[in-house]
Structure formats: structure tokens, C-alpha cells
Amino acid sequence: MKKLLPEELPLPPLPELVKGVMANRKELNMNDIVGTHDILFICLDCLRYDVALAEQENGGTPVLNRYGLWEKRGAPGNFTYPAHHAMFAGFLPTSLEPTPMTKKKMLFFPKGIGMGRVAPPKAFAFDEPTFVQGLERVGYKTVCIGGVSFFSKRSALGKVFPAMFQQSYWKPSFGCTVKESPDNQIAKAIEVLEETFVKERVMMYINFDAIHYPNYFYLDGVRKDSLESHAAALRYLDACLDKLFSAFKKRGQTFVIACSDHGTCYEEADDGYLFHGFNHEAVTTVPYKHFFL
């Protein structure tokens, strides 16, 4: 009988998954990770927490489910541009549990800014404008695979985020109007990894925009975006991720940050709220997890 690899094993029932994740969860020291691990930051742009949770529970995202449960967190912005400025500065989606400012846990910390200007002891502290550039300073090759138009480099605004990285890539086939955009983005990511020495540490950011509007084409015979097509886009993206994770595993140890930057609305409450760019519970509540490959 063939021995199954860990990634081929069936997902345990959700209560057992919860138990296992909580039992093995430890507070991270990013100073032990930086320099020894590749770092992969994937943003599932526009993903709602409630949809992520539903797909997690019904088994619609088997790849992501292997790496623990989504946490319910607060978005750092209500659309892509402000959210990414915050995240690249180290302010990732935050816990919704009441926590004093000075006791908040951070993976990356900008020196001299807030929280008493003292870095949490287990955070990677940096002087640069972004933690991406902070990682570059300590020897990382930094790579951006763009998705939505804020990463397209086709306008002055679309060049701001790519300029934070040593290497940045975008082409129309990575855009949110292309159903196969995650396949195309991952193909480019793997190409970059194959051109990189194994001993060279990589920090890669990918802005997956499959879930961003329009997403109706992930359901047959549909011409309008909805919560159902939002979920279908997430399932499509999840099925693509195994190739990406396998490529990183070949290089050695990898630390992964996976989250949404903001959620979105579909007028499902007949309240007139459509998409995002405003404060609404569906927009400001996002899924987050980090894990090791």
C-alpha cells in the first residue's frame, strides 16, 4: 500500500483539527525565523471572513485547511491601498480580542513608531519604511507578484507597492478579470523560485485577486457577482495553492502569512452596500493565519 504524504492525508473532522492546532500553537519569535526561513506572504484580496470560515468548515478549501484554522481579525483598511500600506509597515490584521496597545503581538515592528516605541521582544524590528525593505537589508531577495491594479505598474499609483520590492511582476493575465489569474501568478512565482539559489533566502508577496470583483465567472451560467461566486473563487484559488507550497517546500523551511486585506459586500442585506471602500462589518472583518511549510 502506498504511504501517503502529509499533504495527501484526509482532513480530520473539524473538532479534531481545532484541538490539534490549539495544542501545537506556540508564540512565534520572528527573530528565529528571519534568516533561516523563506517568507511567503499571500493576500487573498477581498476575501470575507464568513465565507472563508464556511468553506473551511464544509471542506471547500482542503489545501488551506491543512495548515490550521482561520482567525477572525480586523482589517487594516477598507480597500487595497490603505490596507497594504499598513500591512507592509508591519501592521497586519489585528486580533479582535480586547488587548492593550503595548501588549499587542506583532511579527514585524517599525522602530520608533507607537507602542511606547519599544519593539515587542519577539518581533522583527526594522528601520526601513516597510518590513519588506527591512528583510532586504538582512539579505532577503524580495519579490512581488501583483494582482489588482494597485500592483500593475501601469500608473504612478500602480508603481508604489512594486517599488518596495527588488523584483516585481505584473501582466494582464494576473488581473482580476482573468479566471485563471491564480494559475498564471503561481506559474510566475515558481519560475522565480527556480531561478533563485536554494541558499538565498526569499521573501515573496503575492496579491491573489481571483476573489476580487468580478468573480461571477467561477460559477457556470452566472453574470453577476455574489457571495456564492465569491466562495467559488476561493475554492478555485485553494486548488491552485498546492503547486505554490510544493515549490517552496523544495527549497527548505518556509514561513507563510495568509490573510485578506479587506472584505466586500454584495447588497445581500438589501442595504445598498456593494463591494468595499467603506466601513462595514463584512469589509472590516477578515481571515488570517500563519503557518510553516
Segments the model singles out, each with a brief description of its role:
Residues 1-293:
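Catalytic domains that recognize anionic headgroups
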